[in-house]
Amino acid sequence: MQIKDEILSLLKRGKNLLAFSYGSDSSVLFYLLMQEKIDFDLVMINYKTRKNSDLEELKAKELALKFHKKIFIKHAPKFQSNFEKKARDFRYDFFEKICLEQGYDHLILAHHLNDQFEWFLMQLSRGAGLAEILGMQECEKRSNYTLLRPLLFISKDEISSFLKEKDIFYFHDESNENEKYFRNYIRKNFSNAFVSEFHQGLKRSFSYLDEDRKKLYDFENIKEIQGLLICPKNESLIARAVKMKGLLLSTAQRKELLKGDCVLGGKIALAYKNEQAIVFEYETCQKLPKNFKEECRIAKIPRLLRAYLYNHKIDISSLSF
């Protein structure tokens, strides 16, 4: 089992942060990165939902100390409902915070082929477009850092065999057996058996589908200007830009995209000008100066965008939309 050369090339050129849980997948990734002599640090969320949660945290700290790595840990609150989504949002918000504050270029995730197929089936069951169904890529650019998934075309069976072959220590996550979580239900009843039997064909299919996705949705059309993501008024491109800002849209949110300016998830704003969509972090300002408001009016700057421009001291005349 090896990390692809193109991903290794990126890892060798940047500052890297591994999302670590001490589960099987991130433990394999830790081993592979060490084997390739890649420099990286660790970030971990303790949800305190398992009997071994605190022991896993302790052992992760010991591992970081042993190999002279920084480790960033955050304890999650108790989520009363919709655990999967809230836990995911909490996790990625913290990962992004650390990447931005500490200057990491790459966030390394241990998603593998089974995860990719589970996601595919979950989105298919909910009603989703191509951009959402193929929501995982090996290299995924965010606004200020890049997500890397070196194991995305490696199956869970291959990971399990590698763990046994190399005698790699890891913690078993018993919560993965609980079918009250939709992902686990999909995994146990549909995806795992399929991947085990058809993993080679599945790898080829996802590779072909990703190439088709790139041709259908030219993501090079998403431009970044001073923290603003700008793209044509296209639902899939807008959804992609919003995702680059760290928000994964629900089906209901996607339906609202083309209706007009709006705030998504309370943190990402979307505004339109001249058939261009502008995606940015939602900000407010107590009071805009009268001369700035007039400048915005003349330039026909969307109201939702004005506070962001003012707060970041962006020259309106420098904008090309």
Curated annotation (Swiss-Prot):
Principal localisation: cytoplasm
Key words of the record: ATP-binding, Cytoplasm, Ligase, Nucleotide-binding, tRNA processing
Any single biological process term in GO: tRNA modification
GO cellular component terms, semicolon-separated: cytoplasm
Reaction catalysis annotation: cytidine(34) in tRNA(Ile2) + L-lysine + ATP = lysidine(34) in tRNA(Ile2) + AMP + diphosphate + H(+)
Uppermost EC category: ligase
Record-listed E.C. numbers: 6.3.4.19
Binding, ATP: S21, Y22, G23, S24, D25, S26
Gene3D superfamilies: HUPs
CDD domains: TilS_N
InterPro entries hit by this protein: Rossmann-like_a/b/a_fold, TilS/TtcA_N, tRNA_Ile_lys_synt, tRNA_Ile_lys_synt_N
Compartment(s): Cytoplasm
Gene Ontology MF terms in the entry: ATP binding; tRNA(Ile)-lysidine synthase activity
Family of this protein: Belongs to the tRNA(Ile)-lysidine synthase family.
Function in brief: Ligates lysine onto the cytidine present at position 34 of the AUA codon-specific tRNA(Ile) that contains the anticodon CAU, in an ATP-dependent manner. Cytidine is converted to lysidine, thus changing the amino acid specificity of the tRNA from methionine to isoleucine.
Domains (record comment): The N-terminal region contains the highly conserved SGGXDS motif, predicted to be a P-loop motif involved in ATP binding.
Name the record gives this protein: tRNA(Ile)-lysidine synthase
